[in-house]
């Protein structure tokens, strides 16, 4: 069997942050790309089509549409939505359904994006007391384990830490609501370091995996380019945008009072106690260039200035 990807690659989540980055990276590398979308008429879907992505309409609840989308496809990029309060089985159901179709279609390479520390959750502090988002971590592990056990020709699981694009819309409004006032107010301790990766780097790893399936086959790869304190994050944002940004560490109660959701604050406490713990040198050992946060800020300068909502160079007193 040939390990060379010469046919199309199906990208799921292509209208989102990770899938979109992967689709663009694959196009730039010369691959033929299909995107599984529910509604081809959306702005994001049309933007992909304008770049040369072939849109295929499909839904995880319609297996026939998945079979059609997978026809003549040699590679699949998989990324799933996490559990929803009204649908706790969402990630497992959609992940396994896509995996089943990919296995039946005998794709050459299956690249799945999960999260760093997935599979290690039972070692988390207070795991047995359900302190953390149990279903989130269990869903990630369940899909990862199924991929490893399904008997695919080649597969790799990418496990990114926090994605830098969380500082951009739409995620920033929920994750860092105070950034609009030039502040990052969280329950993250001053000494806590947050492992981060750019979405484009995930795209680069996906391209490398589809380009050389045998090299990546069977690996689970934790991804982060840098580990920064929130003060270092604020400094990089200030320097890169010309807008003054400060970081403030609050108690959990204070963080919630200032607009952070309880679930978000819980994840910030997890950052303090556990964190992603990515071996950045191991990630670098694959030889794929990784983006430093300052580089990422520079490349998203105007978008970040709009998020911060202040004129470049303005001071706290001028707001």
Regions found by a protein language model. Give the residues of each.
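Oxidoreductase cofactor-interface core, primarily capturing Rossmann-like NAD(P)-dependent enzymes
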Residues: 2-46, 61-64, 68-71, 78, ...
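Rossmann-fold cofactor-recognition segment
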Residues: 49-62
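Terminal hydrophobic/aromatic helix or amphipathic segment near a protein terminus
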Residues: 221-222, 230, 234-277, 310-319
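Short loop/edge segments at beta-strand edges and connector loops
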Residues: 57, 159-160, 249-251
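Amphipathic terminal alpha-helices
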Residues: 286-319
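Eukaryotic N-terminal targeting leaders
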Residues: 1-8, 313-319
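Hydrophobic "lid"/C-terminal helical patch
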Residues: 206, 210, 237, 268, ...
């Amino acid at each position: 069997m040939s390990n060379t990807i010469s046919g199309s690659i199906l990208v799921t989540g292509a209208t989102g942050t990770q899938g979109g980055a992967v689709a663009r990276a694959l196009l730039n590398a010369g691959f033929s790309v299909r995107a599984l979308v529910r509604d081809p008429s959306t702005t994001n879907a049309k933007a992909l089509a304008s770049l040369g992505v072939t849109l295929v309409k499909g839904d995880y609840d319609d297996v026939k549409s998945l079979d059609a989308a997978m026809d003549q496809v040699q590679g699949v990029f998989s990324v799933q939505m996490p559990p929803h309060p009204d649908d706790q089985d969402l990630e497992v159901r959609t992940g396994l359904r896509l995996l089943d179709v990919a296995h039946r279609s005998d794709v050459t390479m299956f690249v799945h994006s999960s999260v760093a520390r997935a599979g290690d959750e039972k070692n988390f502090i207070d795991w047995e007391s359900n302190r953390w988002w149990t279903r989130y971590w269990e869903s990630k592990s369940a899909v990862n384990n199924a991929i490893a056990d399904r008997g695919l020709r080649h597969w790799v699981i990418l496990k990114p830490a926090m994605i830098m694009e969380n500082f951009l819309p739409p995620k920033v409004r929920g994750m860092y609501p105070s950034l609009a006032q030039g502040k990052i107010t969280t329950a993250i301790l001053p000494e806590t370091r947050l492992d981060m990766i750019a979405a484009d780097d995930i795209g680069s790893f996906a391209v490398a995996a589809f380009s050389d399936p045998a090299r990546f086959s069977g690996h689970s790869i934790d991804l982060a380019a840098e580990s920064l304190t929130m003060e270092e994050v604020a400094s990089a944002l200030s320097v890169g945008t010309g807008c003054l940004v400060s970081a403030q560490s609050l108690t959990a109660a204070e963080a919630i009072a200032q607009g952070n959701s309880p679930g978000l604050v819980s994840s910030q406490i997890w950052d303090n106690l556990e964190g992603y713990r990515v071996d950045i040198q191991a990630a670098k050992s694959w030889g794929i260039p990784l983006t430093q946060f300052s580089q990422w800020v520079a490349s998203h300068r105007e978008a970040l200035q709009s998020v911060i909502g202040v004129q470049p160079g303005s001071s706290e007193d001028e707001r």
